[in-house]
Amino acid sequence: MKAPVRVAVTGAAGQISYSLLFRIAAGEMLGKDQPVILQMLEITPALEALKGVAMELDDCAFPLLAGMVCSDDPNVAFKDADYALLVGARPRGPGMERKDLLEANAAIFSVQGKAINDHASRDIKVLVVGNPANTNALIAQRNAPDINPRQFTAMMRLDHNRGLSQLAAKLDVTLEDITKMTIWGNHSATQYPDLFHTLVKGDVAVEQVEKDWYENDFIPTVQQRGAAIIKARGASSAASAANAAIFHMRDWALGTPENDWVSMGVYSDGSYGIEEGLIYSFPCVCKNGDWEIVQGLTIDEFSRAKMTATENELKEERDAVKSLLPA
């Protein structure tokens, strides 16, 4: 059996984490031969609820769960962490402007970025789930100057999976028939679900669907799926978000399948003309615990306009919190 790795999870008593922690402890994220120590962070008023979650984790008797830490101190929760899933974030309250939300989260993710910088493993892999995920990831990354910026990512896998399931339903195929789904940009309603490179049974997806369905049904459905779930369920996506987090981390740690790629919010190196330093979703392949942006895809005018619109939103979000970012 391998030596245990340390997995930090924030917002650990929340809805998403309740669907996430048990699957990590069961080996779904890092493999059935990898023991884990869960290092769970919560705000002080939620520590009692977190204690209950820890009791349940104990009661599952997971062979791979090698230990647990419950804390309200980021310096404790991120100590020597090999992986971090930043799930906890300030939700948008009634009458709250987007700028207020960005600023409230900037305070949270600045503190967590500093704690990661000061206490985590130098090889830590960070996934930000809490929204606005891309900009929260940027804030954490900027507050961790001693950690390679490539080690901070934002979750786009839920959007990616939503695209897969919508396309499979439309064409009456299985998910195994579809490869190379791509989501570009921000985890928001400006994201661009791109079918020009997606293959269904080896043939280009966009040629198998009507233009009107693609532009006026598929794209807005994927973009607005989160809001549709809140309307139907009365609460935001939790189990599907946890599932996407597991898939994102599993593929990053263990590798993506041959001849396929995944969508990840990653540190832009200027690929496809996207401003360097933004956390932007690109098609990525993973191997040996690292990711690479897929290069050489042809981008037409329709795609370019969509990619630029979501890039501009990310620039606006960054500029809204610029005063809170380290120089």
Curated annotation (Swiss-Prot):
GO terms for molecular function: L-malate dehydrogenase (NAD+) activity. It comes from Saccharophagus degradans (strain 2-40 / ATCC 43961 / DSM 17024). The active site is at 187 (proton acceptor). InterPro entries: L-lactate/malate_DH, Lactate/malate_DH_C, Lactate/malate_DH_N, Lactate_DH/Glyco_Ohase_4_C, Malate_DH_type2, NAD(P)-bd_dom_sf. The lineage of its organism: Bacteria, Pseudomonadati, Pseudomonadota, Gammaproteobacteria, Cellvibrionales. It is an enzyme of class 1 (oxidoreductase). Keywords: NAD, Oxidoreductase, Tricarboxylic acid cycle. NCBIfam families: MalateDH-SF1 (TIGR01759), PRK05442.1 (NF003916). GO terms for biological process: malate metabolic process; tricarboxylic acid cycle. It comes from the Bacteria. Substrate binds at residues 92, 98, 131, 162. Its EC number is 1.1.1.37. It holds the Pfam family Ldh_1_N. Gene3D superfamilies: Lactate dehydrogenase/glycoside hydrolase, family 4, C-terminal, NAD(P)-binding Rossmann-like Domain. NAD(+) binds at residues 11-17, 105, 112, 129-131. Catalyzes the reversible oxidation of malate to oxaloacetate. This is Malate dehydrogenase. It catalyses: (S)-malate + NAD(+) = oxaloacetate + NADH + H(+). Belongs to the LDH/MDH superfamily. MDH type 2 family. PANTHER family: MALATE DEHYDROGENASE.
